[in-house]
Amino acid sequence: MIIDSHIHLNDEELFPRIEEIIDRAKERGVKAFICVGYDRESSELALDIATMYEEVFAAIGIHPSEAKHYKPTDIEWLEANLSHHKVKAIGEIGLDYYWEKTHEAKQKELFIKQIELANKTKLPIIVHMRDATNDTYEILKNHKDKNLSGVMHCYSGSWEYVKNFTDLNLYISLAGPVTFKNAHSPKEIARKIDLSKLLIETDAPYLAPVPHRGKTNESKNLKYIVKEIASLRGVEIETIEDATYKNTVKLFNLGEL
């Protein structure tokens, strides 16, 4: 059994086909899905989907790309809905200097506000980080409660920084890029990381793994990510499935599935 720890079933590419996507994934051993929001509208839909489907859980939050035009009422809505029993995390939140370099201050402000909500509610955080490794680390180190957990989603940083994040009680999640031929950093991390700190995800509809690279991604493709990690480590596929399943259940407090 495996869990897709990060998927956008609320995306326009997937939502119209949501039942067949869930069914195909379940046929391939996917037991549960964390449907992740990135603004208020997508977070509302993530929560609606989680309410409709027993095997789907929601993460709600505001992505750094929304920092320049989010409203205070969005944060108020977020806080008001964090107690819903199907909400399992705040995310995705973080910093992205690749697309949004000109709004660093607003991104940091939004990131810190949502970390503070996580500290208050004890919900784990799902962190988006792109071209912002040092600033992301410094904010987490200085603003996240020591015992608050979370995950570095679709981790794109270096192996050298992995210990910095895991020392902050954060997991590292690998996605489709670990299967890409020249993705040296994800492959190095897959080989070296302590399995007790590893999660897997599709980030669908994005980042489809080989052999479906460039196509619309979905949870049924999680098996290719598991297979690649197992191959890189020289272990059985079941070893990766069992470890990441247990880690995901623990992080998101999913209980018995």
Where do the model's predicted regions map?
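Mid-domain alpha/beta scaffold segments of enzyme catalytic cores
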Residues: 1-257
